[in-house]
Amino acid sequence: MNLTKTLPLFLLVASASCSAQTLVIGLYDYAGLSAKETARLTETAGLALADAGIQVVWADCRGALAVPPAAACEREMQASQIVMRITPTGLPSSNGDRVQHLGKTLATADGGQFASVSVPAVRAQAAEFGIAFDLLLGYAVAHEAGHCLLGPGHSYSGLMRAAWNRKDAEEMSRLSLHLTKQEARKAVARLALAQTAAKM
């Protein structure tokens, strides 16, 4: 019997909050980002999630910083690992609307492991907000990683808001847009549960 599956998620919160939990993100750049843009997006996304107690380990699987063979890109995926695609095209909407979405994640209430971010959509939004493209790209990646940990829902404020506004863009410029405290606790507990299960 696997006891970790019978433990309620909230029982892991106390122990999980004592130390940072690790999330491995396999980055697949199909959009041809420069090394500088890639470095900025990984730094920004890492900082956005670090505030919640999540340490991101990047596996550069495809793109300017990829150095083959990347072991994390080749081995079987673990529960604490996600795939993040950076695409050169727009992303199709699941409900048929014409809104250009920054990203998309295949997620259920239990989370997910596959996400994509659209470079054209991010460029357009960054221009509208008057902020750096690679800064917004980092936040878009962090947002989609959040869906992988939290599920498909959105919040009324912060990193997981459905549609960011200029106030959010100002917070991004200060590197101060984060998960809410409740979201952070849930995300860290999910990672702790995944890592505990992987050891058994």
Segment roles from a protein language model:
Residues 13-17:
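N-terminal signal peptide c-region/cleavage motif recognized by signal peptidases
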Residues 35-145:
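Metzincin-family zinc-dependent endopeptidase catalytic domain
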Residues 8, 51, 151-152:
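A very general structural signal that marks isolated residues within well-ordered alpha-helical segments
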Residues 18-20, 58:
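N-terminal pre-domains immediately preceding structured catalytic cores
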Residues 1-8:
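Bacterial N-terminal signal peptides that target proteins for export
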Residues 21-46, 105-131, 135-136, 148, ...:
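Metalloprotease/metallohydrolase-associated module, dominated by Zn2+-dependent proteases
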